[in-house]
C-alpha cells in the first residue's frame, strides 16, 4: 500500500486529486486541520496527532515538528512514500512545512517530495531514480526561493533565489549559445508565431519600459537593445506609423511597444515585419489579425524594474527608474509647452538608448538617435546625420553631461534649438557659455540616465 503525508494551505485546490488517490487505495496521513477537512469531504485520512500525541501546540503554530514524524521520513524504512506540502503564502512564514519538504528531499531515494500540483502528479505517477532526483532538486530550489522571499521581508535585497522556468527560449544571444529563464517572467504570451528568444525578451522589456513612461500616448521601436524610433500623439495609428518610419530601415524585425490597447485598426495598419509587439492589452480582433503573422504578442504585468549583468561570476543588479525632479532652465529662451513636451519625450527615450547617447526629437517624433558610442561628440554627430534637415528647430537630449562644448557645436550647426542634459562636468561653465554663444536653450536634467 502506498502512503502519502499531506499538509495543505489551499485545501480545496487539491481535493480532487486526493480523492482520486484515496479511491486508488492510497493511505493518506495529514496534519490535523487537513485531516479534518478531508474527512468532512468524504476522504478517509489519518491524523498525524495519533503519532505525535498532540493535535497542535501554540494555537496551531506547531503541528508536524516532532521526532516521530521526521523519523518516519528520514529513516531507512520510511513510513511514507510521498510527502506533499502546500506552504503558507507570503507574508506568513511556514516552518514545519519547509522542514517536511527538506527532510523528504534529503531521503530522496526512499521518499518523494512534492510542493505543487505538477510535482505531486510526478511523485504519484512516476517512480524512477531520475524523477526522484528531479523532485529532490526542485524541492531544494523551491524552499530556497521561499526562504529568500521571507528574508527580503526583513532586509530588502539581502537575498535572491530563482527557479529555472519551463519557458523555452529559441537560443541565447547567438544561435550557438543556450539560454534559460530563471524566475517567472511578468508577461503573458498571447500569441507565439515562433519560439521567443533571449534577445526578444531583453528588447521587449526595454521597449516596454520606455513606452509605459512616455509623457502621453505613444510607441517605441527597439532593435538590439536601443530605440530606433519613437512617437507620441493622439491618434494610435499615426503614432505607430511615425514610430516605425522614424527609422524605417532599422525598424524591420524590431520590437514594438505601445502604452495603449492594441486594437484591430492599429493591428491592420502594421505592414512592417516585427519580431514582438508589447501592449498593456490586446482586443480579440487585434489578436486574430496579428496571429496570422510570425510575431509574438506580449502582455506585460506588474514588476519591479532592475538592470542586471553577470560579471566575474557575480550577478550585479541596479534599480532602473527615471530620475525624480524637473528640468531647470540654465541659459536661453524658455521653450513653449509643446517644445518642453518634446524635450521630456526625448529625455525619456534617450534613457533606453545605449550610452553614450544623444537623441533629437521634433513634433513628438524621434528624428535622429546616436547611441552606443564611446564618444559623446560622435553620438551627437550620428544623431544629426540621421536627422538631416529635420534637426532644424528640433530639441535634443543627452543621457549624460557634455564633457566638452564640441557636441553643442555639432547640434547647433544642424539647427537644434534646445538641449537637455545633466551637469557635472568640470567644464560645465565652458559648456553653458558655449550654449549662450550659440543661442541654444540649455535645460539641466535631474540626473544622467546611462544604459549599458
Swiss-Prot record:
A Pfam family this chain is assigned to: MGS
Name by which UniProt lists this protein: Bifunctional purine biosynthesis protein PurH
GO molecular function: IMP cyclohydrolase activity; phosphoribosylaminoimidazolecarboxamide formyltransferase activity
Pathway: Purine metabolism; IMP biosynthesis via de novo pathway; 5-formamido-1-(5-phospho-D-ribosyl)imidazole-4-carboxamide from 5-amino-1-(5-phospho-D-ribosyl)imidazole-4-carboxamide (10-formyl THF route): step 1/1; Purine metabolism; IMP biosynthesis via de novo pathway; IMP from 5-formamido-1-(5-phospho-D-ribosyl)imidazole-4-carboxamide: step 1/1
Domain notes: The IMP cyclohydrolase activity resides in the N-terminal region.
UniProt keyword list: Hydrolase, Multifunctional enzyme, Purine biosynthesis, Transferase
Domain of life assignment: Bacteria
PANTHER family membership: BIFUNCTIONAL PURINE BIOSYNTHESIS PROTEIN ATIC, BIFUNCTIONAL PURINE BIOSYNTHESIS PROTEIN PURH
Domain MGS-like intervals: 1-115
Gene Ontology biological-process entries: 'de novo' IMP biosynthetic process
InterPro entries, alphabetized: AICAR_Tfase_dup_dom_sf, Cytidine_deaminase-like, MGS-like_dom, MGS-like_dom_sf, PurH-like
Coiled-coil stretches noted in the UniProt entry, renumbered to this chain: none
GO cellular component, one term: cytosol
SMART domains recorded: AICARFT_IMPCHas, MGS
Source organism: Thermotoga maritima (strain ATCC 43589 / DSM 3109 / JCM 10099 / NBRC 100826 / MSB8)
EC number, UniProt record: 2.1.2.3, 3.5.4.10
CDD domains, alphabetized: IMPCH
Catalytic activity line of the entry: (6R)-10-formyltetrahydrofolate + 5-amino-1-(5-phospho-beta-D-ribosyl)imidazole-4-carboxamide = 5-formamido-1-(5-phospho-D-ribosyl)imidazole-4-carboxamide + (6S)-5,6,7,8-tetrahydrofolate; IMP + H2O = 5-formamido-1-(5-phospho-D-ribosyl)imidazole-4-carboxamide
Family under the similarity heading: Belongs to the PurH family.
Amino acid at each position: 500500500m502506498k502512503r502519502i503525508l499531506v499538509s495543505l494551505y489551499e485545501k480545496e485546490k487539491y481535493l480532487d486529486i486526493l480523492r482520486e488517490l484515496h479511491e486508488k487505495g492510497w493511505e493518506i496521513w495529514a496534519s490535523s486541520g487537513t485531516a479534518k477537512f478531508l474527512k468532512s469531504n468524504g476522504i478517509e485520512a489519518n491524523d498525524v496527532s495519533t503519532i505525535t500525541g498532540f493535535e497542535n501546540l501554540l494555537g496551531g503554530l506547531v503541528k508536524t515538528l516532532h521526532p516521530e514524524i521526521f523519523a518516519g521520513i528520514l529513516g531507512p524504512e520510511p513510513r511514507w512514500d510521498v510527502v506533499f506540502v502546500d506552504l503558507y503564502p507570503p507574508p506568513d512564514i511556514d516552518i514545519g512545512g519547509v522542514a517536511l519538504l527538506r527532510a523528504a528531499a534529503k531521503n530522496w531515494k526512499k521518499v518523494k517530495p512534492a510542493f505543487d500540483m505538477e510535482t505531486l502528479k510526478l511523485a504519484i505517477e512516476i517512480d524512477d531514480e531520475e524523477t526522484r532526483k528531479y523532485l529532490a532538486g526542485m524541492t531544494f530550489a523551491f524552499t530556497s526561493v521561499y526562504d529568500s522571499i521571507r528574508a527580503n521581508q526583513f532586509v530588502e535585497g539581502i537575498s535572491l533565489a530563482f527557479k529555472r522556468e519551463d519557458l523555452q527560449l529559441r537560443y541565447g544571444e547567438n544561435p550557438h549559445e543556450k539560454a534559460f529563464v530563471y524566475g517567472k517572467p511578468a508577461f503573458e504570451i498571447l500569441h507565439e508565431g515562433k519560439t521567443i528568444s533571449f534577445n526578444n525578451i531583453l528588447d521587449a522589456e526595454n521597449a516596454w519600459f520606455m513606452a509605459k513612461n512616455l509623457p502621453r500616448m505613444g510607441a517605441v521601436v527597439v532593435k538590439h537593445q536601443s530605440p530606433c524610433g519613437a512617437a507620441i500623439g493622439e491618434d494610435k495609428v499615426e503614432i505607430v506609423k511615425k514610430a516605425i518610419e522614424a527609422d524605417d530601415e532599422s525598424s524591420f524585425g524590431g520590437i514594438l511597444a505601445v502604452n495603449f490597447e492594441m486594437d484591430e485598426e492599429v493591428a491592420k495598419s502594421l505592414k512592417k515585419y516585427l519580431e514582438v509587439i508589447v501592449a498593456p492589452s490586446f482586443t480579440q480582433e487585434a489578436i486574430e489579425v496579428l496571429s496570422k503573422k510570425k510575431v509574438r504578442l506580449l502582455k506585460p504585468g506588474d514588476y519591479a524594474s532592475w538592470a542586471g549583468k553577470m560579471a566575474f561570476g557575480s550577478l550585479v543588479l541596479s534599480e532602473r527608474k527615471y530620475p525624480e525632479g524637473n528640468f531647470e532652465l540654465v541659459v536661453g529662451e524658455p521653450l513653449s509647452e509643446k517644445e518642453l513636451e518634446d524635450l521630456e519625450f526625448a529625455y525619456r527615450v534617450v534613457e533606453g538608448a545605449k550610452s553614450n547617447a544623444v537623441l533629437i526629437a521634433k513634433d513628438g517624433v524621434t528624428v535622429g538617435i546616436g547611441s552606443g558610442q564611446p564618444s559623446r561628440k560622435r553620438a551627437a554627430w550620428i544623431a544629426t546625420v540621421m536627422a538631416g534637415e529635420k534637426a532644424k528647430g528640433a530639441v535634443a537630449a543627452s543621457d549624460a553631461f557634455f564633457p566638452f562644448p564640441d557636441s553643442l557645436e555639432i547640434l547647433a550647426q544642424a539647427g537644434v534649438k534646445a538641449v537637455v542634459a545633466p551637469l557635472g562636468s568640470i567644464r560645465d561653465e565652458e559648456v553653458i557659455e558655449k550654449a549662450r554663444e550659440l543661442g541654444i536653450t540649455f535645460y539641466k536634467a535631474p540626473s544622467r540616465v546611462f544604459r549599458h
